[in-house]
Amino acid sequence: MRKPLTPKAKRRLLGLGQDLLILVLVVSAVMLAGGSGLLDFAGDISGGVLGMQSGQNQGGQKEYTAAAEPLSMMLTPEAGAHCGVMYSQEELYSAYDRFSATLAEALGSSGEPEQISEEEWRAALNETGVFFDFYCDFQLSSLAIWLGTEINGPAAGHTARRICISLDNGLVWLSYVRSRDEGGFYRCSTSVQAGEFAARVGESIPNGAEFVFELSPTYDALDPYTVLMQGSIVLGSISGENSLRSADSEALYTAFGLSSYLASTYPESDGTLVSIEGEATLRLGADGELKYSFKPIEDESAPKLSPTDAIELARRLVENTAGRYCGEASLRLSYIYLSAETGEYTICFDYVYDGVPLRISGREHGVEKTESGERET
């Protein structure tokens, strides 16, 4: 049972109304390699793509922060007996903290991926193990990097939203669902120690949680791998308001590498405030919409963004703009897509409150960012 939000908490929850701050960006990989103040606001990433030297730590390694975390987990201490974790950010943090190192080891030691049947995937979900639902698909290589390791082999390029580490015949396996590309269910061998893993998962106490596919009868309208909790779920109420009313305009200029003194600023008839500096344009709409665009200088030799670097750049920019005005909520990666035709990434972030994703009326996503190797619009 959860307590409703206090009035103070409601007042702090900014940016979640229909007029909430929406960030629409189109940024060129060429610009990222050498041309804008956008590179300077966060630092740390480097190496040809995001600047020359500013982005490396003292050990010469790029630094990344996780853009996504599981919004539900299922711990299975013994076959068929589950402990679901949902609707509580504190409990999700605790559970993920307990098993993130195991997930990192499983990813880093994963062998050649083999395709399995859906029945085998479901069997893995019922064995002793841990299931993670990250809310959106992204490359396993990105997840590995966020966890401080790396994947060598074909699995690195596979995208997945749902991942399971399970025990089978004395071995620990990494299984996942590829809902994009060719699709299908896959598993890899790992070097995770079975005894230690089983003991850690065995500390979980079953709470009656189930996957939808385990119900009898099942519900065709629901995703079969949705985690269902037992008992009544009480969610606190939330309120929102236009974030731009409380936004520091100077901080927004700085985040986008603009100067309020150098930019030419004028209002439009609908109340939108437009600021132009060089090839950059920042539009602050009276309805709570913020748009930034930049036309870079073309450079054929500029390196292309990797998916992990594209997500990290987007995360940092979001953190320093819309992320400043989230109140009690947070922004988490919810979508990434790379167009093979245009070389353009579309990266979206959605608001999450206490482990629950939020949908804004009239908006598909909380924040949308597009990065390409071409010009931006």
Predicted regions and their residues:
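Extracytoplasmic beta-rich ectodomain segments of secreted or membrane-anchored proteins
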Residues: 303-372
